[in-house]
Amino acid sequence: NADVIYVTNETKNTVTYNGLTGIGNILKNASRISKPLAVRIIGTIDTQTRDADGTKTTDINNGVVAIDGLTDKIISNGKDSYFNMLDVTGSKGGLTVEGIGDDANILKWGFTFKSNCQDVEVRNLTFSKYPEDACAAENSKYFWLHNCVFNIGENKYDITEEQDKGDGDGATDMNGNSNVTIAYCRYNQTHKTSLNGGSDSVKSYNYTYHHNFFNGCKSRLPLTRQVNLHMYNNYYLNCGTCIDARASA
């Protein structure tokens, strides 16, 4: 009995649901959705972000993104950037975001499921050139991510003090959640691949990674803090590190 909406690059800002227009605005207001919803992605959804390099003095607001509802802040002299992210907040009705066919791509943007989202499924999507996180979850529960591909990210406006976002931030960062499964995903040359626990004091519960392929990845495969983690049948090929368990993980 789920509602279903289809999204293409041409309709990303015009699709309507629940009195909202544009896929960014629909999911940003997911707390207003009370029944199961399936969002079906067809083809490549592109922000069309320009590729010019930024610097530490760059201050660009509004005009970086081409999907309504995404974050668009790049702050000069700040410690961090946060743009081209879709913050999906408070979804409790049951949400699925899935690609249709073998060419469903999220290009130059990503998702963060936060503020007590629950019963979320993300499947059959390819994430590429994301400047921040590709598909992350914070303070949420019952999150199932499977059959997705994560290619290397790209952030040409990296103004962080560490200058470590050139390849994007995390592919699948999971912080402060419970009951998370990541399965049958492929990671290609990702840098800060998967962080579980943003600090030594944030606790997470019941994470499982299984049947994932880490192909030439650099780090955080995953990096875990304060979480009980079950990993099995994952394959690592030419990676910089492997599992990095810290802080009572």
At which residue positions do the language-model features occur?
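Right-handed parallel beta-helix
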Residues: 93-103, 118-129, 141-156, 160-161, ...
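Extracellular beta-strand-rich solenoid/capping regions of secreted or surface-exposed proteins
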Residues: 18-35, 50-96, 105-123, 128-141
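Long, ordered, amphipathic alpha-helical scaffolds
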Residues: 1-5, 71, 249
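Acidic glycine-/aspartate-rich tracts in secreted/extracellular proteins
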Residues: 11, 44-47, 102-103
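Right-handed parallel beta-helix/beta-solenoid
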Residues: 1-20
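Acidic, glycine-rich low-complexity segments
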Residues: 41-43, 96
